[in-house]
Amino acid sequence: MRTATKTRITAETSIELSINLDSQAESIISTGVGFLDHMLTLFAKHSRITLNVKADGDTYIDAHHTVEDIGITLGLCLKEALADKASINRYGSAYVPMDESLGFCALDLSGRSYLVFDAELTNPKLGDFDTELVEEFFQAVAFNTEMNLHLRVLYGKNTHHKIEALFKAFGRALREAITINPEIKGVNSTKGVL
């Protein structure tokens, strides 16, 4: 089984996170940030992984440290669970509509970290959640997984719908990339390593 568990403790947050890439058991997510709980639940469902997260953070300031540190920890768990990346597709992409919004994700589990984030999130807050933290989250995931990640909202009006389309597209693209393909012998790279 491709699994990983990490604990990350700083002066600002305490994160316990585990993933199982080959299980679709019910995910248990409690971050202290309601909107992020919602998005991570969607991500887990659409990536068809089991994701468990327990986080305590300095949310009395804002959610920045909590959101970023969860992204870091998720990225580290993905990197560990994928190990040498033998026989995985490596690449994944998905378009996801959410009512009037359309989100797109393309990713490469290349071992090279990069994020392209192209989304106009016109509403700066959804409840207590600062929408600029969406990019911070994906930056942390991409750099700690060592993936090349492209996210784009092609169009839409409702900020919640735009973000939801991105998280679902990310989940679906990740599922494609991490799927073991029996036609791929070893690592899917001419370099022989990812």
UniProtKB/Swiss-Prot annotation:
* GO cellular component: a single term: cytoplasm
Q: Which Pfam families match?
A: IGPD
Keyword Calcium part of the UniProt annotation: no
Question: This protein's superkingdom?
Answer: Bacteria
Enzyme Commission number(s) from the entry: 4.2.1.19
What's a GO biological-process term for it? L-histidine biosynthetic process
Q: InterPro entries this protein is in?
A: IGPD_sf (IPR038494), ImidazoleglycerolP_deHydtase (IPR000807), ImidazoleglycerP_deHydtase_CS (IPR020565), Ribosomal_Su5_D2-typ_SF (IPR020568)
The protein's name: Imidazoleglycerol-phosphate dehydratase
Per the similarity annotation, which family is this? Belongs to the imidazoleglycerol-phosphate dehydratase family.
Q: What is the lineage of its organism?
A: Bacteria, Bacillati, Bacillota, Bacilli, Bacillales
Tell me which species this is from: Listeria monocytogenes serotype 4b (strain CLIP80459)
UniProt keywords (A-Z) are: Amino-acid biosynthesis, Cytoplasm, Histidine biosynthesis, Lyase
Q: Which CDD domains match?
A: IGPD
Which pathway is recorded for this entry?
Answer: Amino-acid biosynthesis; L-histidine biosynthesis; L-histidine from 5-phospho-alpha-D-ribose 1-diphosphate: step 6/9
What HAMAP family does the record tag this protein with? HisB (MF_00076)
GO terms, molecular function = imidazoleglycerol-phosphate dehydratase activity
Reaction(s) this enzyme catalyzes, per UniProt: D-erythro-1-(imidazol-4-yl)glycerol 3-phosphate = 3-(imidazol-4-yl)-2-oxopropyl phosphate + H2O
Where does it live in the cell? Cytoplasm
Give me the disulphide-bonded residues.
none
Q: What class of enzyme is it?
A: lyase
